[in-house]
Structures are given as structure tokens and as C-alpha cells.
Amino acid sequence: SCAVGGNIIPMAYGLPESRFLGIDFSPGQIRAGQNAIDCLGLKNVNLMQADILSLRKNIGEFDYIIAHGVYSWTPEPVRERLMEICKENLAPDGISYISFNAYPGWHMQGTMRDMMMYHTRHIEKPRDRLEKAQDLIGFMAKSVNVNDKYGVFLNAYTNLLNVYNQFDIQRRRNKQEDEFGLLHDDLEEVNDAFYFHEVVE
């Protein structure tokens, strides 16, 4: 999903002879991205609001297909369709970039996700869930020896949360509260990790 086009719009600006197509399920994200395109006067990039399951081969042939933040956070039918699109729409010498949560590294963060999901299981409001999850991470970071391997991970994770938090505060100051969530990745209902061979095979 292209979200607001934060990746492809700068590329379209810097590569005026190339053409770009961004696709996202969220109408709000597409509108925000289109506003940026209009302000820049770009003619070589288009954004499309669509469900990936409804996309057909006639969207065109691409030298690059980038799917960041999709594979691990969507159900199996969407993942399968994404792979089909790469097969159908990628140029013969094209490259597809698909990000996903990868094992074995994800095992440690997956443990934290399980704890956060359990800790926030009775909380419905997204903002309250995020704050409760942050509290848990902070508590865990303080409870584990910083020299322990798990302690090193927790402290690094806490630092990452602080960066996310500052970014989120700035967005709210700018009244940009759309579907973006502070811990969107880790608290998403679907969040699956895979070994590399499971994706490429």
C-alpha cells in the first residue's frame, strides 16, 4: 500500500521521465497523497484507491513493484493476490520488493507483541490501547537488566517507541490524525511472521 505516497511521490519528483502508480485501500490516504501531487504539479504519478483483491492485470507492467507494510499485516488471500500481481504485472527483468516480519529475528519482538495484545485485550479505544502498550514496554524495560540480551532489546524498543511518540505528537499538532497509529504494526489484528523460504517458495 502506498499510504499518502511518501515513498513514490519524491521518486516521481526526482525521476520525471519515469511513471509511478500507487495503490492503497484507504480513501483518506489517497486524498492526502493526491493533494501533495497537485501541489507539486506532478504529471508522472497516479494514486488509486482500491482493494488489492480486485486489481486486475490491466493495471500495467512495472519495472518495480514495491509492497511495504502489506505482506505480514494482511490475511492469506491478500498475500496470495499480491504474489499473483507480481507474477502478472512485473516486467521480465523487473524487481519486486516485499517487506515482511522475518523469522528468526521476529521471535523476540513477537513475544512482546503477544504480551501487548494480552495486556490490552479488554481495551477498545485505540489511543488507550497504545498508551497501555507503551506502559507495558516501559515497565518491562525497567524490570530487565540492561546488560541482559533481552534488556538490550527492550531498551532499544523503548527508544523506538519514543521516536514514534514524538512523530505522533507532531501529527496531532498538525491535525493529521488519519488511520496512522503509534503501534499500528504490533497491535494490528493480523501480524504474521515468516521464514524467508516461506515467502519465496
Regions found by a protein language model. Give the residues of each.
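Conserved SAM-binding loop of SAM-dependent methyltransferases across substrates and taxa
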Residues: 4-17
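Conserved SAM-binding motif I beta-strand of class I
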Residues: 19-24
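Conserved SAM/SAH-binding beta-strand->alpha-helix loop
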Residues: 26-28
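Conserved class I S-adenosyl-L-methionine
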Residues: 95-152
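Rossmann-like AdoMet/SAM-dependent catalytic core
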Residues: 148-201
